[in-house]
Amino acid sequence: RDRSPSRGLGDVYKRQDLDIDDFKQLKPEDYWYSVIYGEGSCYTGEDIRKRTKKFWIWKDNMSWKIEELRLYFKDMQTRLKKDHPELFLCPDLSQWGYFLNVYSQKQCDSDNPDYSELWDTAMRGIDMYAISPYVDSCHFITVPARPDASPDAYVTSCQHSMMRVMNEGKECIGGIYWGRYIYRDLYAFLTPEEIVGTMTACGVDGYTSYGMNGLDDGGVLNRMEDDFLDSLRRGNTWCAEVIPKRGKSKFKEIAILFPSEMSDYEPFDVENNEIRRLDMLGWYEICCDLGYQTDVISYHDILENKLNDYKMLIVPSNDCYFAEEHTDMEKMIREWVTNGGVVLHGPDCGLSKNCFGIQGIPCEKTPYIYQKPVIPQGCEFQRYETGRCISAYADDAGKCIVMQEIEKGKVISCGVQLGASYVAKNIPHVPYEQRNKEMYPIIQARSTLLEDLLGVCGKPVSGICERGIEAGVFETGMVLVNHRSTPYEIGNLKGNRKFTNPVNDTVLLPHSAVWIERE
């Protein structure tokens, strides 16, 4: 599996220190990771940074699995459709999400053994974006929980954004887990109608669910309380009425580049992997909270010239970007930027280095300034020597965020992982060296930094800019979902309303949804 014709088996032999010239000379102890390093072992972050043989063998093993699975689906599509063209191919590609999986190794206790290899799709050898052409609907089950199993409806929203992209021009069948989750009672914090609202806002044509029964995985929907079942009934009744009115034409504003290489090759066990995964989720939440219509696209979509549908491309953390060649994609991104597109990326970004020659310099974890001091979070920190300074590190430690204009377009380079900072589980203390200065993490700084960064590509079509309020904008109207624990006032919005749980025409209850039809 190789994205560039310039790479061949000679490169594979070289990076694995193999002194051979014929593939048939290979033995399992030459190329198979578990034979060489033992079952259950994993490479480290140091192996990534130093591009060691250990990393390359893992990568090449996973590449083979991914390509074999892609070829399997391609072959099965041909076989099944040949004799039964009426078949609708919609396999469940994953039981527990994609990329934003629960890191169950940290959740298991004496009652539950460690199933982390089953849950983490980075251990599976699967690229769902690559499989999507061979099914009628590319589909998997989502769980509204972060890697630490804490409830988060935006995880389901983000993964349905992926599915919407995978199924452009086709039926989009969503997937959700209902019931008492094995690691956390998710629906004690979320409601079914809220999640149905999120899937509807993401553009699904319908959905399938998991959790009807089976105590081994939680679920047991038949054992859930009446308030859960009532909420599920309200959500299903609502979406059955709204989806035909809503249609399929969802607006597009911002694209987030799915970190395919990290998804393919880097499991949770690599240090700080969880933070890097959360960086993508954090950027998705930022975009939603600021009202933008956001899609998580892959390099496959850029190669199909779909980047022209968007105003901004956000590149989240991806320390495995170097593991594949991206010559054609990078050329297309450069052309898109020169014609007016905006790229926003974080520290240690291989894409910005290859596309634009922009490379940060590693630096200490230091507060940065935008209107007021902000405490940094994340695991990567860099400063930049060139570009117009948008935010500087405190104590003259250099430029933290810079912007460079490239013909009609712009590149915004961030020295901190703003996405990971936005969804960090904990908030930090003021750094000791800052003594008694007043400063806060980005989520509490009351700075307009994030709004101003995304505002470079224009104002959101939704007109909504509220944390915890998700908006899905379609040609015929808008779906609003209230993820907050407090009601949201919508009296200023025009259009006929259809609530999942109505009280009057102006109040959207916590953890519920509304369809507002365009007048």
Predicted segment positions?
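Polysaccharide-binding and catalytic clefts of secreted carbohydrate-active enzymes
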Residues: 1, 7-158, 162
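The substrate-binding groove and active-site-proximal loops of carbohydrate-active enzymes
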Residues: 51-71, 95, 112, 141-152, ...
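A short helix->loop->beta-strand "cap" motif at the edges of active sites that frequently abuts
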Residues: 85-87, 167-170, 338-342, 409
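Hydrophobic faces of well-ordered beta-strands that scaffold small-molecule active sites
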Residues: 89-91, 138-140, 172-176, 206-210
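Active-site clefts of carbohydrate-active enzymes
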Residues: 94-102, 158-191, 214-222, 258-265
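A conserved amphipathic helix/loop scaffold
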Residues: 188, 317-519
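Helix-enriched interaction subdomains in cytosolic or periplasmic regions
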Residues: 191-235
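Aromatic-Pro/Gly-enriched surface loop or interdomain linker
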Residues: 204, 221-308, 474-476
